[in-house]
Amino acid sequence: MNGYIKTDKVFLFFAIFAVTFILFVLRRPDLITNPQFWAEDGRYWYHQAYTLGPLHSIILPQNGYYQSISKITASLSLALPLWCAPIFFNVIAISIRCFVVMFLLSSRMSSYKLLP
């Protein structure tokens, strides 16, 4: 019985993730159909990962801040062709938004009244 409960939770996790991902893409389909670097994505983070190397670019602060997620994304996107890098950035950004929705719907937030 415990195996079924765990399997159901995993299925629910992926189902909620897929639905929220699709909803975010339907809201702005150009994120997938016409991907492009946005703001610092290409000018700083991808450029630093490409020229300085993935590890050095991650520990290099940008304007006094460590932009960890963005720089790790840039470092991972080096494994892809250049034309795939912007869509990779967009998929990671949409996924992070999906995880926020999933967190708000999780049992950890059950003590808070999110909806009236």
Tell what function each PLM region has.
Residues 13, 17-21, 67-71, 90, ...:
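Alpha-helical transmembrane spans of integral membrane proteins, capturing the lipid-embedded, hydrophobic core
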Residues 40-52, 96-97:
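Hydrophobic, membrane-facing alpha-helical anchors
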Residues 91-115:
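Transmembrane-helix motifs of polytopic, lipid-linked glycan transferases
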Residues 1-24:
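Start-transfer (signal-anchor) and selected internal transmembrane alpha helices
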Residues 43-49, 59-87:
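Short hydrophobic/aromatic helix or loop-helix immediately within or flanking a transmembrane segment
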